[in-house]
Regions:
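Electropositive, glycine- and tryptophan-enriched low-complexity nucleic-acid-binding patches
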Residues: 6, 10-25
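General helical structural elements
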Residues: 6-9, 142, 161, 208, ...
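Short, glycine-/Ser/Thr-/acidic-enriched flexible segments
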Residues: 1, 150-151, 193-194, 198
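Solvent-exposed aromatic/hydrophobic patches embedded in short alpha-helical segments
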Residues: 3-8, 12, 117, 121
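Conserved polymerase palm-domain catalytic core
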Residues: 19-185
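Active-site and adjacent loop segments of nucleotide-processing enzymes
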Residues: 187-219
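Duplex nucleic acid-engaging cores and interfaces of nucleic-acid transaction enzymes
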Residues: 1-7, 41, 51
């Protein structure tokens, strides 16, 4: 199964990769979380975008709709055998509490091709925001939306809700989605981003120190 998935990945990635949104960084060749953080800092400085909506998606990869995944792939791939292979992979089912159950939503985590399918799925969001000239940075399901003013941020947040929940059938965790001023720092991917510098999140520093203490012999 993994061999087949790898073969599919080798076929599909070069087809979709060139047209993905330039501010999408997760699970893409030669792209990293550090580049995503650098892009966010650049947006703050170059375009004067002083407010950021930090979107929180609830169990994103467990909620990907199979028909929408296949529709996304079908935009560029019409080969029925490829589409059928992807469908069979998606609908292979999962073991839950010791029992086998078929699935009609979700991309199995750990699958070789799952990250690419997730990017194909979420590219609809990326391109819809781009079409509206709304600047975003996305690393997998970690999304930042940039705005000039609090009012604009609220408007952009509603647009993002409509696309993610309406078009893509995902669930936005509204309690954990919030708007912040860049001067207070924007936590993202283990860093805190400010207009003029980036620091490591305190909890990451603490975890590192705890690990060092754990590995250091005590006299």
């Amino acid at each position: 199964d993994r061999v087949v998935q790898q073969a599919l990945l080798n076929i599909l990635q070069p087809i979709f990769e060139p047209d993905f949104h330039p501010s999408s960084y997760g699970y893409r060749p030669k792209r990293s979380c550090h580049q995503a953080v650098a892009k966010a800092e650049r947006f703050m400085n170059k375009y004067g975008l002083r407010y950021v909506v930090d979107m929180d998606l609830s169990k994103c990869f467990d909620r990907l709709d199979h028909e929408l995944i296949l529709k996304g792939v079908n935009r560029k791939v019409s080969d029925g055998s490829v589409l059928n292979l992807i469908r069979s992979f998606l609908e292979a089912g999962v073991m839950k509490d010791g029992a086998y159950s078929e699935t009609d939503i979700g991309s199995p985590q750990g699958g070789v091709i799952s990250p690419l399918l997730a990017n194909i799925y979420l590219d609809h969001f990326d391109q819809e925001m781009r079409r509206r000239n709304i600047r975003i940075v996305r690393y997998a399901d970690d999304i930042l939306v940039f705005a000039r003013t609090p009012r604009q941020a609220e408007r952009y947040k509603q647009i993002a809700y409509d696309i993610l929940e309406g078009d893509l059938k995902l669930v936005v965790n509204k309690e954990k989605t919030h708007t912040t001023s860049v001067y207070k720092g924007v936590p993202y991917l283990g860093f805190v981003i400010y207009p003029k510098h980036v620091s490591i999140q305190p909890k990451k520093i603490k975890a590192f120190k705890d690990k060092v203490r754990e590995l250091t012999p005590r006299n």
